[in-house]
UniProtKB/Swiss-Prot annotation:
Mutation effect (residue 547 to N): Loss of kinase activity
NCBIfam families documented for this protein: sensory_box
GO MF, one example: ATP binding
Entry's Gene Ontology cellular component terms: cytoplasm; nucleus; plasma membrane
The reaction(s) this protein catalyses: L-seryl-[protein] + ATP = O-phospho-L-seryl-[protein] + ADP + H(+); L-threonyl-[protein] + ATP = O-phospho-L-threonyl-[protein] + ADP + H(+)
Cofactor: FMN
Tissue expression notes: Expressed in gametes, pre-gametes and gametes generated by pre-gametes (at protein level).
Function of the protein: Protein kinase that acts as a blue light photoreceptor. Required for non-photochemical quenching (NPQ), a mechanism that converts and dissipates the harmful excess absorbed light energy into heat and protect the photosynthetic apparatus from photo-oxidative damage. Controls the energy-dependent chlorophyll fluorescence quenching (qE) activity of chlorophyll excited states by inducing the expression of the qE effector protein LHCSR3 in high light intensities.
Positions annotated to bind ATP: 410-418, 433
Gene that produces this protein: PHOT
Family: Belongs to the protein kinase superfamily. AGC Ser/Thr protein kinase family.
Residue ranges of every copy of the Protein kinase domain listed in the record: 404-712
Its EC number(s): 2.7.11.1
Protein's name in the database: Phototropin
Organism: Chlamydomonas reinhardtii
Amino acid sequence: MAGVPAPASQLTKVLAGLRHTFVVADATLPDCPLVYASEGFYAMTGYGPDEVLGHNCRFLQGEGTDPKEVQKIRDAIKKGEACSVRLLNYRKDGTPFWNLLTVTPIKTPDGRVSKFVGVQVDVTSKTEGKALADNSGVPLLVKYDHRLRDNVARTIVDDVTIAVEKAEGVEPGQASAVAAAAPLGAKGPRGTAPKSFPRVALDLATTVERIQQNFCISDPTLPDCPIVFASDAFLELTGYSREEVLGRNCRFLQGAGTDRGTVDQIRAAIKEGSELTVRILNYTKAGKAFWNMFTLAPMRDQDGHARFFVGVQVDVTAQSTSPDKAPVWNKTPEEEVAKAKMGAEAASLISSALQGMAAPTTANPWAAISGVIMRRKPHKADDKAYQALLQLQERDGKMKLMHFRRVKQLGAGDVGLVDLVQLQGSELKFAMKTLDKFEMQERNKVARVLTESAILAAVDHPFLATLYCTIQTDTHLHFVMEYCDGGELYGLLNSQPKKRLKEEHVRFYASEVLTALQYLHLLGYVYRDLKPENILLHHTGHVLLTDFDLSYSKGSTTPRIEKIGGAGAAGGSAPKSPKKSSSKSGGSSSGSALQLENYLLLAEPSARANSFVGTEEYLAPEVINAAGHGPAVDWWSLGILIFELLYGTTPFRGARRDETFENIIKSPLKFPSKPAVSEECRDLIEKLLVKDVGARLGSRTGANEIKSHPWFKGINWALLRHQQPPYVPRRASKAAGGSSTGGAAFDNY
């Protein structure tokens, strides 16, 4: 303890109010001794202040601690960087526990590291632990170490780091640039601004996690049909930790009183790939017996083969007078049928949500992606880029990476990198999206990639991104796409005073986005990830909707023309369409304008999904409630988009994800006092952000219902792409793309 300074009184005062488990080490002293430890740290480890302060944190290590993970921490400290690892640590009494440790440096304004903050989260019951190592070859459906870093550690680390920064007299957010290196899902600087870091979309793994049911998922394509996912409720019921469950067959729940005939029925159903509901006596880890109304349901792939088995457990045990005796079954037949129905409904919900997570079982899941140049589509008939690429393909047989020269990186998303590339020997530029095949398979994102590829191949619209070709190597996929000089609408928004646009400009962008969404719905697609980051600005200034990996592609649309008479789609008044005969539907001219004014094009997908996907601030209430959702989620997101473009923030954003969700579900819509917005615009937003999906504008007749709203009066829908955009990027501008361009590309806005 000699020579180790006591923690500053201000540090102790500030940190004492935090209930998290963490320590603070002094980076200016040899061996980085601990100068502060929270009460939570003492409680978790069993050590006292005299045994902790002045020592390095390595006293928590033991025989099972992985030296490779320890080396990651040492390397990060040496470089002054952040890192996040999962370590097997030991309490003072020798009890091992899994510790999700996140180390974050605190830097002074001159860039010198003064402190290291180490946040610990006991994830023993949540992590997969050694399941991967002990059951080699068992691919887990959800990688929990990554999920815990993103969903549990991130907010705790933010709380502690900001508190230490304040105590150190450092402007909050100074450490964040370094902290972004840690795999916590937080990218870019923290701050108080609504868009201080990119909003990462929630994926299909979140769907499974959020299903509030007692269930597990097994993979029949692997020997002995091992469990690859177990819900928290399943772990609570059985008393097992996730590490003890993953990679094992479900038979460990059987015991002395389990009926062998019932077990044989389950085995036969697995062999046949059929659905089954039975009542079986199971046992918890502690040996307590319980009646389990067990439903087994196959989740099939596109070929009809069972890709996963969902096992739903419903505890139907009556209160037993003696915990030592097996419970007696005394339910009536009607009660038993009701419980069985409950399990079957839950299994159906889970299977539906899982559809998007089933990666192809073929040896090469990427075989469906063609390497040839896409067919030339009508809206690109005169595109010089198509012509140049076709000539190269005819000359060399196929497109190769050698045909392109990398100019610079445009951005990095959740599943890949985007580079600006130039075709060798020409001035033609493209955006190349690169994905690591192995990472996509490891993270269960193959289905997402295939969905995006299929949608890009199918669409042809002036307000949607264009895919020219896909180049495959042994390790990577490269999507060669149309390059947009203006970058993201997100960048334009951030470059404006107070991060907001003029109402007439918002109307222009909203009308083009609405038209793009209408086209996607016409093809049976639900977009599901609308936000400024996914709206690109073409060199002409018009929008291009991009990123379709979270879209729902299993719906279908049967377009029909319906006579509306005197009652219109919006607000009970007849839609006011321009005199052009094609302006209402965006289609070709047929018949007189007078005739078409009395008809409406209905083209909404008959789609019903349960996946929990999208960006949290833009999620519709029905997505959060897991009640199943359809195309109306896109109209909710359109309302959020219009609100954000006008006010510079989203209406329901909270400090935490769960707070945001709570606001979306329960809080009323409130408009800021500034800037002044027209009554028609506020009315449109209110009607789009109706929490009852059945009453939401657009839920009855789709996009035309929204187009007929008074706020869009005067928009010539048929000639949108020929109108002058509010901002036209300079093609010679060096600030070529992505949100990294700042405001440099928007000087002429």
